[in-house]
């Protein structure tokens, strides 16, 4: 039997639930699917179906993640929910599930907790553009004044991390009561869904962003010239376009004279395509794996940056011991390993396996990176951590 076809008749958005353990993230995810299933826009997923998340591997790291999909009248949503706190940290840092927006779930009965803060900080550092708040368990804390205080605390915390705390929509409800079919609380879940549709803009599609393709391989075709192959990360490219070769060496411009996929000429290549690009006036030794082809001026080479990283535990196949400033692992960006030196920040003296830390990294060679670029940290070919560039320093 053929797979069901994915019909692209609505804008697509990636969302996820974030927040402290036991504040109701998974229950809310189940409630959203149940409420939408009554309108024929989702398959209802029970709590234990979502909680029993399969393991996935991303950048050499195992992460438990549940993917749920649903539609509204306006959009198609892919919703990610992680069972454990460590899974959230790993998921957000590796970019395993890129979020266009997050639903921050805070228990009205408990208010802000340590992971509430940590997830907001992570959302800021990995570049989640929008957050909406669902104040959950309001049935357990019916005192209006207490809920007002909790809401104020959440808004202040969001502002502290540069989200527009005063303007972010806060919906009060009870995911459990909504699941049980209580009409008042079902209405609150509907309000949350409507807020997702209206408060979050359609994301700029990858194909509309400036062209970028990491170079995976380079070879010469006799009589035609040098071809570089790779997967287009974003944007589009066609024969006649001017591009820059960025990273590792001096940036240089060239013209793409042909684009091919599976030995056939393409009118244009776009995000997601695996292609070969024929370059004018470029020799085999002028370009190498680890560089990128990009729209001129859209990306610059950098060698120093601040990063947010997650360090694997021994059980996850990571280091058995802590590391300190001057640690020199390899940083794997897109298609290549580059050695770099780590400096720990603030009063942090060492980073232990399992830690989530902020580091300053100086690479031996400059490469094409931007805020939000993801990388792995490797030692002797095995992954010991994952990171995301949070700020460029040169």
Curated annotation (Swiss-Prot):
Residues 60-64 are annotated as: G2. InterPro entries: EF-Tu_GTP-bd (IPR041709), EF-Tu_GTPase (IPR050055), EFTu-like_2 (IPR004161), EFTU_2 (IPR033720), G_TR_CS (IPR031157), P-loop_NTPase (IPR027417), Small_GTP-bd (IPR005225), T_Tr_GTP-bd_dom (IPR000795). It catalyses: GTP + H2O = GDP + phosphate + H(+). CDD domains: EF_Tu, EFTU_II, EFTU_III. One of its GO terms (molecular function) is translation elongation factor activity. Residues 174-176 are annotated as: G5. It is found in: Cytoplasm. GO terms for cellular component: cytosol. Residues 10-204 form the tr-type G domain. Pfam families: GTP_EFTU, GTP_EFTU_D2, GTP_EFTU_D3. Mg(2+) binds at residue 26. Residues 19-26 are annotated as: G1. Keywords: Cytoplasm, Elongation factor, GTP-binding, Hydrolase, Magnesium, Metal-binding, Nucleotide-binding, Protein biosynthesis. Its EC number is 3.6.5.3. Residues 81-84 are annotated as: G3. GTP binds at residues 19-26, 81-85, 136-139. Residues 136-139 are annotated as: G4. Monomer. PANTHER family: ELONGATION FACTOR TU, MITOCHONDRIAL, ELONGATION FACTOR TU-RELATED. GTP hydrolase that promotes the GTP-dependent binding of aminoacyl-tRNA to the A-site of ribosomes during protein biosynthesis. Belongs to the TRAFAC class translation factor GTPase superfamily. Classic translation factor GTPase family. EF-Tu/EF-1A subfamily. This is Elongation factor Tu.
């Amino acid at each position: 039997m053929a797979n069901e076809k994915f019909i692209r008749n609505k804008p697509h958005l990636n969302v996820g639930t974030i927040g402290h353990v036991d504040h109701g993230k998974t229950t809310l995810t189940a409630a959203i699917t149940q409420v939408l299933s009554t309108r024929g826009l989702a398959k209802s997923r029970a709590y234990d179906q979502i909680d029993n998340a399969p393991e996935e591997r991303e950048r050499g790291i195992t992460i438990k993640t549940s993917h749920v999909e649903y539609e509204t009248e306006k959009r198609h949503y892919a919703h990610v929910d992680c069972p454990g706190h460590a899974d959230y940290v790993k998921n957000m840092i590796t970019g395993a599930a890129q979020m266009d927006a997050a639903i921050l779930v805070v228990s009205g009965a408990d208010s802000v907790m340590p992971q509430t803060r940590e997830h907001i900080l992570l959302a800021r550092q990995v570049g989640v553009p929008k957050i909406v708040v669902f104040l959950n368990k309001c049935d357990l804390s019916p005192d209006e004044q207490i809920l007002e205080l909790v809401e104020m605390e959440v808004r202040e915390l969001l502002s502290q991390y540069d989200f527009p705390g005063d303007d972010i929509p806060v919906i009060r409800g009870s995911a459990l009561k909504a699941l049980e079919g209580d009409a008042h609380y079902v209405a609150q879940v509907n309000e949350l869904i409507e807020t997702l549709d209206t408060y979050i803009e359609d994301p700029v599609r990858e194909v509309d962003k400036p062209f970028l393709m990491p170079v995976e391989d380079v070879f010469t075709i006799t009589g035609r010239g040098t071809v570089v192959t790779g997967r287009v990360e974003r944007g589009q490219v066609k024969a006649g376009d001017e591009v820059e070769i960025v990273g590792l060496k001096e940036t240089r411009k060239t013209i793409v004279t042909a684009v091919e996929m599976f030995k056939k000429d393409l009118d244009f290549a776009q995000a997601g395509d695996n292609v070969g690009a024929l370059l004018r006036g470029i020799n085999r030794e002028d370009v190498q794996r680890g560089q990128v082809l990009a729209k001129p001026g859209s990306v610059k080479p950098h060698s120093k940056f601040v990063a947010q990283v997650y360090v694997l535990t021994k059980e996850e196949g990571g280091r058995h011991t802590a590391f300190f400033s001057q640690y020199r692992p390899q940083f794997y960006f897109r298609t290549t390993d580059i050695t770099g030196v780590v400096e720990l920040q603030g009063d942090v003296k060492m980073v232990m396996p399992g830690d989530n830390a902020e580091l300053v990294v100086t690479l031996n060679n400059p490469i094409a990176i931007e805020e939000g670029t993801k990388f792995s940290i490797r030692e002797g070919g095995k992954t010991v951590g994952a990171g995301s560039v949070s700020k460029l320093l040169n």
